Amino acid sequence: VESLLDGMEAFGFDDIKTYDDFSSRVPVKKYEEIVSMIDACRKGKQNIFWPSNIKWFAKSSGTTNDKSKFIPISNESLENCHFKGGKDMLSLYFSNNEKSSLFQGKALRLGGSRALYEDNNTYFGDLSAIIIDNLPLWAEYVSAPSHKVSLMDEWEVKLEAIVKETLNEDIRSCLLYTSDAADDQLG
């Protein structure tokens, strides 16, 4: 494990250019086998999982062994996975609905709770909170309720605040960060 903690050099990440390169050099591991690497990354050690700094960790609600897991989230994964999906969806929608008035109103934004915790200049919490905290500024102008209300912890209080903030808004779509919002709020 120590050689893995020395960084990506163990896998030769600098030379990985294709999927085949990656799959032949980086072994598939169970979470329990890399927990020490996750812990080191959460304590600020970099170049373990990704060449850029990892400062975000999505905290799972527990899966295989009923314990929460911390999943490293890079800026690149936010941009190229989580945000790209939304951009692709909007591109397809507008390609097929050229006269859409979607952006003449706002999107009702629902996400999990804002339970972000800072430790060693790294942060962990619900994936939806991480996504909402990192959305581009323009997303704030086309979404309701506010960032603060979107990430409130208590569902009943949050629901009242959502109604209050959106009652007079022209809501035309719904944004639901399903990775954990479904578990937290939709039962």
Where are these regions (language model features)?
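Active-site phosphate/ATP/adenylate-binding loop shared across adenylate-forming ligases
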Residues: 1-182, 187
